[in-house]
Structure formats: C-alpha cells, structure tokens
Amino acid sequence: MMNLASIDIGSNGARLLIKRFDPEAIREEDRIKKLMFIRIPLRLGKDVFTLGKVSKEREKMMLHMMKGFKQFMKLNDVEAFRACATSAMRDAENGKKVLKKIEKQTGIKLEIIKGQEEAQLLYNNLVEKTDSNEGSFAYIDVGGGSTEVSIIHDGVLAESYSYNMGTLRMLNGKVTAETEKLFKENLTRYAEQYGDIKIIGSGGNINKLNKLARHSKQDSKNLTLAELKRLYSMMQPLSIEEREISFSLKEDRADVIIPAAEIFLKACEYLKCESIMVPNISLADSIVDGLYEKMMAKTEE
C-alpha cells in the first residue's frame, strides 16, 4: 500500500491529487482511493498570454500554494509525487527561473512538459480506464493555454497534436488564425482518414458542461451535440455574474466555459460527431496513475 501524489500546474487552475494504491486489496474499488483533491484558481495564463511572463504577484501566490501542497503531502504520508506544468509555463519567458525559485524554497521540482507528453499521459490513462481498443477515437483535452488532440485507432495512438488554442488564450484574443486553420484542417482530415470517429472530451469545462446537462438525461458519460448547443445558447448571452448565479458556476469557470464549449462545438463539426464521451479523466489522474505504473514496473524488475 502506498500514497502517491500529482501536482498539475495548468494555465487556468493548479491541482494537487493524492491517491492511495493498494494492489492487494480484495475489492477492486479499494485498490485505488482518492484521499485528497485540491484545485486553486491560479490563472497563470492571465499573465503569460498578456504579459509574456509570470508576474511577481502570481509568482508569490504560486510559492504560497506550493508550500501548502507540500504540507498536505506530508500530512497524507505521500511516498512519491510528480509535479508538472503545462502550456502557460512552457510559454512564460521567466518560466524556468520561477520553477527554480520554487524548487529552492519548497524542494518541489516542477517539470515543464511538452504538449506531446501531455497528450501521451492522458492517452495512457484513457486506455486503462475505458474500452477504447476498437474503432477510432479523438481524445480532446481543452485547457487554459492549449488543446491536445490525440487520435486513437484500434487501441494505438496514431496521431497527436498540441494546439495553442486554450480558453484563456481565446478570452485574451491570443489564438492565431494559423492555429485555427490548422485545427480545422487536421480534424477534417481525421474525419476523412479514420471514418467514424468518437470524441472523448477532457478538462474541467467539458466535465462541468456534462454535469449541467446530466439532470435531464439518462446517460451520464455522454454529452450530445444537441445538449452542448442548448447549454451554449443559454450561457453565451449572459454576463459572467449571470452565469455564476444561473448555473452555480465559480468565477474562474464562468468565463472560460464559453470558449471551451466553442472548441468542442468546432471539433464536433469538423469530425462530424453527434456526441462527446466524458469519462472524467484529468491530467492530474494521468500523472499519478502513470507514476504508480512506473513504480510497480521497477519493483517487478
């Protein structure tokens, strides 16, 4: 039995996930238990996609947060952890400098992972959790800074691409016409090349959209295009404050949920899909589960 953790520093939020792994547990549901999950609306992308760097204020906030994460890991007897930063830290001109400072003050080494590795981590976890071995699937993870699209064909990762087209970038008008064109071209080609493709959606926004649609449907793991269009048409005209009240959204979700819905609507159009599978798998899950697999493989050597 071991307690492991993952830290995911995204462009919109930062997450700490602690899980207990017990491969010898009799009941399957006891083999992996979530002990703690914390999400902080850090909003790194707000700085990076406008200033090009992490501001002093955000850096200070990040330091306090990482010190807190360290204490939570101590309290939960975490044996090992992996800490990763994605799109915003990749783009920040002072990203490496900030991470060195954090490591010096907290002892937590944060890795800046490339979009390709991000997609690979998510894909590995997806194969573990879903029956996606036959047919073609487009695994789409929409974050604050980037959107990862991975094509899985008959259980094999066929193609993967990271687009600088995240929700915070869209809100700040930082998505180029070239990126949008490439997204459309690639997804249209996938539809022609791989035929009937099913979309698997990932990220806090699609999870929330699916949850909002859930009360009116039987299938909790599938969000239809009609439901997504209906929710979008209801939310889009509202102000951020009105969305918070009408849909019980937090402030840091009420603004980004609109561009996220737009990305998924475009994906459905280009891939000719009528629904999105939402298995509720996050990058934080993928990181900690990947760490466990790695540790188990070492013990078997």
Predicted regions mapped to residue ranges:
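N-terminal basic/disordered segments at the start of proteins
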Residues: 2-32
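Short glycine-aspartate micro-motif
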Residues: 4-8, 137-141, 199
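Conserved ATP-binding subdomain of kinase catalytic cores across diverse folds
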Residues: 27-43, 48, 64-67, 74
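Acidic, divalent-metal-coordinating active-site segment for phosphoryl/phosphodiester hydrolysis
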Residues: 144-151
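Conserved Rossmann-like nucleotide-cofactor binding loop
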Residues: 12-14, 145, 207
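Helical "lid/coupling" subdomains associated with nucleotide-phosphate turnover
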Residues: 18, 47-78, 86-136, 151-301
